[in-house]
């Protein structure tokens, strides 16, 4: 059994997500200690617990220590064979963080897996669902992974109640991904949404982002969306379509924060990611690591993050030496697969 120290690096929930996904994929039991040791409220939070329970169902696993506040967990997987996964986080816990744990494992299942997750679609400290649908899945398709996500209803902090549905097909053809420097940007697209708020909020966010992005001198098209849910909230995600991948930027609205500031923030984030001229933004880099181990290739990231380094560390705990990382945290960097896992 592999033992993973959950206090490594920034000691967050990501160690947990990646460890359990890899355990499910490899069939290798795992024991995780010191879970989220470096966080103000250590141990499992509801969204981690629901991700674990979904992976338990997916991998037919035996699990010990799966309760809120638990600092140690044992996960013993059997077979990846479930065809349907339903998760109700029960709070505004992040849907996309639960999906980050599920996606790699679902890609290795024997059959197509359909999923439905209830929780927060657009919440602080996690990728918004529009980013996952338009940037992450676009990159995974290049690796040969076919998946789709549909937003049924948005959910914001604190009420949640967002619903997404989707599917992942079995990963049949593993395509190497070489995404180094981009040479051109074709266009920028985006989605600006307002939930239980006036339509002008979404429109003002979009307009401010568009103005900021005009300096790229490419077509910019941002859709606006107005919807109803359990509570109010707004946000915007913008992404640049380059000749290799898409890079993204996003921002969330909050009470007292003008819509113009929200739109400008997302646009500036995207411009920041585009600056180094590399194909992979800092949010996508760490998400790709578990998949890259099996596909092979090389990615150049606009910024090396602690999340990226931590994910490499977890993957190599399971699979041995796989990656070479050139670059330090906070700076652009290069990740190369030196040994692809069959």
UniProtKB/Swiss-Prot annotation:
It is an enzyme of class 6 (ligase). GO terms for cellular component: cytoplasm. Keywords: ATP-binding, Cytoplasm, Ligase, Nucleotide-binding. It is found in: Cytoplasm. It comes from the Archaea. ATP binds at residues 100, 283-287. GO terms for molecular function: ATP binding; RNA-3'-phosphate cyclase activity. Belongs to the RNA 3'-terminal cyclase family. Type 1 subfamily. This is RNA 3'-terminal phosphate cyclase. The gene is rtcA.
């Amino acid at each position: 059994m592999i033992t993973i120290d959950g206090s490594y690096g920034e000691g967050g929930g990501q160690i947990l997500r990646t460890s359990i996904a890899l355990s499910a994929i490899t069939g290798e039991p795992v024991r995780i200690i010191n879970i989220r040791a470096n966080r103000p409220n250590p141990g499992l939070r509801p969204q981690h617990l629901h991700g674990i329970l979904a992976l338990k169902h997916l991998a037919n696993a035996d699990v010990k220590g799966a309760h809120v506040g638990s600092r140690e967990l044992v996960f013993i997987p059997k077979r990846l064979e479930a065809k349907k996964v339903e998760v109700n986080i029960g709070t505004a816990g992040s849907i996309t963080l639960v999906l980050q744990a599920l996606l790699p494992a679902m890609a290795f299942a024997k059959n197509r897996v359909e999923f439905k997750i209830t929780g927060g679609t657009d919440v602080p400290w996690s990728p918004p669902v529009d980013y996952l649908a338009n940037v992450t899945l676009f990159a995974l398709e290049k690796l040969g992974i076919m998946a789709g996500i549909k937003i049924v209803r948005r959910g914001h902090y604190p009420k949640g109640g967002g619903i997404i549905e989707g599917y992942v097909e079995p990963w049949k053809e593993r395509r190497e991904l070489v995404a180094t420097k981009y040479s051109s940007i074709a266009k920028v697209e985006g989605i600006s949404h307002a939930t239980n708020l006036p339509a002008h909020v979404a429109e003002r966010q979009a307009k401010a982002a568009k103005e900021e992005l005009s300096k790229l001198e490419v077509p910019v098209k941002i859709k606006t969306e107005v919807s109803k849910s359990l509570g109010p909230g707004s946000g915007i995600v913008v992404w640049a379509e380059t000749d290799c991948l898409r890079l993204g930027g996003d921002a969330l609205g909050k009470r007292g924060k003008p819509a113009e500031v929200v739109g400008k923030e997302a646009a500036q984030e995207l411009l920041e990611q585009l600056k180094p001229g590399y194909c992979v933004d800092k949010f996508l880099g760490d998400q790709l690591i578990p998949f890259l181990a099996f596909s092979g290739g090389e990615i150049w990231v606009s910024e090396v993050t602690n999340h990226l380094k931590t994910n490499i560390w977890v993957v190599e705990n399971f699979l041995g030496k796989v990656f070479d990382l050139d670059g330090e945290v906070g700076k652009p960097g290069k990740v190369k697969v030196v040994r692809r896992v069959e």
